[in-house]
Design a protein with these regions (language model features):
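Duplex nucleic acid-engaging cores and interfaces of nucleic-acid transaction enzymes
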Residues: 553
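Conserved small-residue
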Residues: 1-542
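Short active-site loop/helix that positions an aromatic residue
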Residues: 543-545, 556-560
Length: 560
């Protein structure tokens, strides 16, 4: 499933080697490889800048920003040479410029190793050499494990990198090794640093307790199959703040400017040492004055904190190893000492779309008549027929894959698609019609597999920030959203009062939730900064039904 979060602009790219263990095994774990040969063998890959890459630059005494500044200078010089604005425009000069750019982009101390066999892995962890550099295993990311890819680093840098990655945590505190490595792996996420907030508070998660009906799966000692028990009005505890925190609107605005994004932004996915999750803009200062009548909150360590001294509120589910530090001040001091900063990986997209494709999992649980099926596939059939029938608007819409806007031509990737945007008569050209016909054939094949267009979109999900504020100020937790409801500024503005929620991978029909959308002055006021976010109530089991999702994303099919 796609994220309804957008990769932020201008994350710089670096290059690293990516080798298979079989390649090293054949070289007796001591490989000499020229960069030209590595490129020809697709053994040089591009990675987005990350905290780990910044750590490696820092350990080498290199300024990461200085690298990009020099690369930009060299690219400008190359452009001037190509345009005839430089006296020395020889091919040798251009070649030397590109060679320097490639050298600056490469991080030779960072190597991705693809494990071809268990025996190879057991040998690789003892270390190997490539071009005179000895590499040792550093960590595996959650995404890397799925593709048998492990991060190795230059042996001489590993102790310093591990010290930074551990970030002064209490090493005596027990930690599950797999989880600890997963948390350390956050340092390899593509991210862009942002300025330090003017104060941070870490608060306890907001738990909401109620009774509900649910299915309980139990493992049986004498059977390989689980036992399903129907529980009626059983006790339920929901973490309504799982994976998200709050940021002052001013902080989100400042970070948006630093990221060179177009505002307003309804939320950001952030990283720091052992810290991950979404933060959403919410005026907790206003809540303190109008609702709590207090400026004091108790943080997760039990310390009193003044809410007006903070721009960022983290929850314990975001700061994974909070209990390995004495206080928030201790945590932030270690971050500063080890070179950690807050950084942003993705943002909530400022623009949503009114239609998206389903997948077969979302359709399978429904029992539909022939008429139901005809109604469901009608928009998709209309798209295909319209394009083949020469409708310029539908052709343009299909080629872009998203809703049409006036400035669409500037963003179209294919020449013939741009041509249609400029002159619709291009559709009469045999070549263009042939190309579109090939694409439509593929589109029809996808539709047969359940990729049906309906009115709906992917939405970033949040718990109720009003309830979180009630919790952190020690008030009775009620929230603003009753059971079975949610709030969506985007869909409310379009007159939608009910949605169906799905989340992939979807295993059964119980994961489809019908949700009524609340729209009242109180919700509109308190949630006014959270554009394009689906805010869920904490008084039902929607998050559990959506395969135990935390505050990330869900597909919503709009119903009116």
């Amino acid at each position: 499933m796609q994220w309804r979060r957008k990769q932020i602009k201008n994350i710089r790219q670096r290059k690293v080697m990516k080798l298979h263990t079989a390649r090293l095994r054949k070289a007796n774990w001591n490989l000499t490889l020229s960069m030209s040969d590595a490129k020809r063998g697709n053994e040089i890959v591009t990675l987005a800048e990350s905290t780990l890459i910044r750590f490696i630059d820092n350990a080498k005494g290199v300024d990461t920003g200085g690298i990009y500044h020099r690369i930009d200078e060299l690219k400008s010089q190359a452009a001037r040479i190509k345009n005839g604005y430089e006296e020395d425009s020889s091919p040798a000069t251009l070649k030397s410029i590109y060679a320097e750019i490639n050298k600056l982009l490469l991080v030779p101390e960072y190597l991705l190793l693809v494990i071809d066999s268990e025996a190879d892995y057991q040998r690789a962890v003892f270390g190997f050499t490539v071009n005179g550099i000895t590499y040792k295993r550093l960590l595996a990311t959650a995404a890397g494990v799925k593709t048998s890819t492990i991060i190795f680093v230059a042996d001489y840098l590993k102790p310093e990198l591990l010290q930074k990655l551990n970030n002064g945590r209490d090493m005596i505190k027990p930690a599950v090794p797999s989880k600890l490595e997963s948390y350390m792996g956050l340092s390899a996420s593509a991210s862009k640093p942002v300025s330090m907030p003017r104060g941070v508070i870490v608060v306890k998660d907001c738990y909401m307790r109620f009774k509900d009906d649910y299915l309980l799966l139990k493992d049986l000692d004498d059977s390989d199959e689980p036992y399903i028990e129907e529980v009626h009005q059983g006790d339920v505890e929901v973490d309504n703040s799982d994976g998200y925190g709050l940021a002052s609107p001013a902080l989100i605005e400042r970070w948006t400017a630093e990221l060179e994004e177009d505002g307003p932004v309804g939320g950001m996915c952030i990283r720091n040492a052992f810290c991950k999750g979404m933060v959403f803009p919410f005026d907790f200062y206003e809540f303190a004055g109008l609702v709590a009548n207090s400026d004091t909150v108790i943080d997760v360590w039990g310390h009193e904190q003044n809410i007006y001294d903070a721009e960022l509120i983290l929850t314990e589910s975001m700061l994974k190893l909070w209990d390995s530090y004495k206080s928030c001040e201790d945590y932030l001091a270690n971050c500063k000492e080890n070179g950690y900063t807050f950084s942003v990986t993705k943002i909530v997209e400022p623009q949503q779309h009114e239609s998206r494709e389903l997948n077969y999992q979302f359709i399978q649980p429904f029992e539909m008549t022939d008429d139901d099926i005809r109604e469901l596939i009608a928009p998709t059939i209309s798209d295909i027929s319209g394009v083949m029938g020469g409708d310029p608007a539908k052709a343009l819409l299909y080629l872009r894959g998203v809703d049409q806007t006036e400035d669409s031509a500037a963003r179209l990737s294919d020449d013939y698609a741009q041509a249609i945007a400029i002159d619709p008569d291009v559709l009469n050209d045999n070549y263009v019609r042939g190309q579109i016909s090939k694409l439509i054939s593929k589109r029809a094949d996808r539709a047969k597999l359940g990729r049906i267009r309906v009115r709906g979109d992917f939405n970033v999900v949040s718990g109720d920030p009003y309830a979180l504020c009630q919790s952190m100020f020690g008030l009775e937790v009620t929230g603003l959203l009753p059971r079975g409801t949610a709030y969506s500024q985007y869909w409310n503005e379009r007159g939608v009062n009910e949605v169906l929620a799905f989340r992939a991978p979807m295993t059964n029909g119980h994961s489809i939730r019908k949700i009524k959308l609340v729209d009242n002055p109180s919700c509109r006021w308190w949630y006014r900064y959270m554009r394009n976010v689906m805010i869920l109530t904490g008084w039902d089991m929607t998050m559990a039904a959506e395969n135990g999702c935390d505050c990330d994303k869900v597909y919503c099919h709009a119903r009116q």
